């Protein structure tokens, strides 16, 4: 009896083991096929990432995507609009520049006035100096007509009166100041020498002056004697000049005169 029971238990255990093995085989069919497929898939992914097959391939990670999913790209309308906007702005700027560079209808004519072509309108000689300032306050320069004079470099004579304040503001005005015991100031306006008086100037030509104009040219006898010791100077004597209008017999006399003139200038 005991032997029969043990045999029946062994038979039941064997049947249960067979049924469990059959269930496991049904749940995991072809295990080797799946392991091979997974290893092949990982190898292809690594190979595709490391070395792309084409230069034009813009999707290096396309292998990692779901092969069964839909690869339809999304709509890119806002991106295309953003890309087109800079081009439109650039074309608008170019159009505006072209419109600015277009010449305006009608010729443009301009006149250029040089300093030597200006002339001052000088009124008639006034009766008093007070009337002169009132009349010449609103005077305006006139333009010279092209053919009114023979040439630009020719000396000209201006007759009349002119305020010194207006003359000093002109570009054609030059002032020469001479220092010494007899200081004087020479005003030159354009091509003319000016004779000055308080507040009013008189014009005269810059031609060589006559002997009677002793104020602006040294006398003919200034080389006949020394300005310091009054020694007479002959044609064969050495003459030492100072400031162009003073002659001396020696360098000592000239140095004395120079020291005296410097002392007078400092006072």
From Swiss-Prot:
Record carries keyword Zinc: yes
Region (Disordered): 1-29, 124-156
Zn-finger segments (FLZ-type): 221-265
The keyword Zinc-finger is annotated on this UniProt entry: yes
Any GO BP annotation: cellular response to hypoxia
Complex formation: Interacts with KIN10 and KIN11 via its FLZ-type zinc finger domain. Interacts with KINB1, KINB2, KINB3 and SNF4 via its N-terminal part. Interacts with HB21/ZHD3.
Superkingdom classification of source: Eukaryota
Coiled-coil residues: none
The species this protein was found in: Arabidopsis thaliana (Mouse-ear cress)
GO MF term list: zinc ion binding
Keywords: Metal-binding, Zinc, Zinc-finger
InterPro entries given in the database record: FLZ8/MARD1, Zf-FLZ_dom
Induction trigger: Down-regulated in response to mild as well as prolonged energy depletion. Up-regulated by glucose and sucrose.
Gene name in the database record: FLZ8
Function statement: May act as an adapter to facilitate the interaction of SnRK1 complex with effector proteins, conferring tissue- and stimulus-type specific differences in the SnRK1 regulation pathway.
Pfam (any one): zf-FLZ
Compositionally biased intervals (Polar residues): 15-28, 126-141
Protein name: FCS-Like Zinc finger 8
Family per record: Belongs to the FLZ family.
């Amino acid at each position: 009896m005991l032997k029969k029971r043990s045999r029946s238990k062994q038979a039941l255990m064997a049947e249960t083991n067979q049924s469990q093995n059959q269930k496991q085989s049904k749940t995991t069919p072809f295990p080797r096929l799946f392991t091979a497929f997974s290893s092949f898939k990982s190898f292809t992914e690594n190979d595709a990432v490391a070395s792309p097959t084409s230069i034009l391939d813009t999707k290096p990670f396309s292998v990692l995507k779901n092969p069964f999913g839909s690869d339809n790209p999304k709509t890119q309308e806002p991106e295309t609009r953003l890309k087109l906007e800079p081009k439109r702005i650039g074309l608008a700027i170019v159009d505006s520049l072209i419109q600015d560079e277009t010449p305006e209808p009608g010729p443009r004519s301009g006149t250029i006035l040089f300093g030597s072509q200006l002339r001052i309108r000088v009124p008639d000689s006034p009766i008093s100096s007070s009337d002169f300032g009132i009349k010449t306050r609103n005077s305006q320069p006139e333009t010279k007509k092209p053919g009114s004079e023979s040439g630009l470099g020719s000396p000209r004579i201006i007759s009349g009166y002119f305020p010194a304040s207006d003359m000093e503001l002109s570009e054609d005005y030059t002032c020469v100041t001479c220092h010494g015991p007899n200081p004087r100031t020479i005003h030159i306006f354009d091509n003319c020498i000016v004779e000055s008086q308080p507040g009013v100037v008189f014009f005269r030509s810059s031609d060589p002056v006559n002997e009677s104009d002793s104020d602006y040219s040294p006398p003919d006898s200034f080389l006949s004697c020394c300005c310091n010791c009054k020694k007479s100077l002959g044609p064969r004597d050495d003459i030492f000049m100072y400031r162009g209008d003073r002659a001396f017999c020696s360098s000592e006399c000239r140095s004395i005169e120079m020291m005296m003139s410097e002392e007078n200038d400092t006072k």
